[in-house]
Swiss-Prot record:
Intrachain disulfide bonds: 11-40, 22-35, 24-30, 34-57, 48-54, 53-79, 66-86, 73-105, 98-110, 117-167, 132-178, 145-155, 162-204, 198-209
Species the sequence originates in: Crotalus ruber ruber
Presence of the UniProt keyword Calcium in the record: yes
Any Pfam family: Disintegrin
The protein, known as: Snake venom metalloproteinase HT-1
One annotated GO molecular function: toxin activity
Length: 216
């Protein structure tokens, strides 16, 4: 019967092997302050080696910010002093008003039509007039609210702001007052994002404009 020959671990070869907690090379070359290069074990005082809340082999002090808030709907996370990891990402409750009541919080963001138009087309592009969104009642390539089994479902009159996204191009020269985004890869980009404010006290949910209190 053949047998596998397993070489004994060699401390100092910069390979983490069985029985070693670390291996940073020979003592004169070691650049890892957490590792005892003579034993290939972590120093007894080491609390961590890496992580957003780890510095110089110790847990970062409690209260040090490790993940800044990305919007007014997000919550900044701080180290606990007991772990090398930043706490799980948390955010303000869905439906909380944001951006001076222009929107409502949704999963840490504040989705509004203007920001969606800007993200797709850049500067000088804004939310289109209400008349453009009326096209979403047609239920065709130009305008619809959602897809069911590949079929484009028209919007009810009260849901038109929750279908296809329409933007207004204010660039100099001839421009499109009912500009839409066309994507062969991701038709979700063509649509108003979930959680977007569609009327006072209402947000978009699955192609419907519903009361914010019942949406979440």
């Amino acid at each position: 019967l053949g047998t596998d020959i397993i070489s004994p671990p060699v401390c100092g070869n910069e390979l983490l092997e069985v029985g070693e907690e670390c291996d940073c090379g020979f003592p004169r070359n070691c650049r890892d302050p957490c590792c005892d290069a003579t034993t290939c074990k972590l120093h007894s005082w080491v609390e961590c080696e890496s992580g957003e809340c780890c510095g110089q082999c110790k847990f970062t002090s409690a209260g040090n910010e490790c993940r800044p808030a990305r919007s007014e709907c997000d919550i900044a996370e701080s180290c606990t002093g007991q772990s090398a990891d930043c706490p799980m990402d948390d955010f303000h409750r869905n439906g909380q008003p944001c951006l001076n009541n222009f929107g409502y919080c949704y999963n840490g963001n504040c989705p509004i039509l203007y920001h969606q138009c800007y993200a797709l087309f850049g500067s000088n592009v804004y939310e289109a007039e209400d008349s453009c969104f009326e096209r979403n009642q047609k239920g065709d390539d130009d305008g619809y609210c959602r897809k069911e089994n590949g079929e484009k479902i028209p919007c009810a009159p009260e849901d038109v702001k929750c279908g296809r996204l329409y933007c207004k191009d204010n660039s100099p020269g001839p421009n499109d007052s009912c500009k839409t985004f066309n994507s062969n890869e991701d038709d979700h980009k063509e649509m108003v994002l979930p959680g977007t404010k569609c009327a006072d006290g209402k947000v978009c949910s699955n192609g419907h404009c519903v009361d914010v209190a019942s949406a979440y």
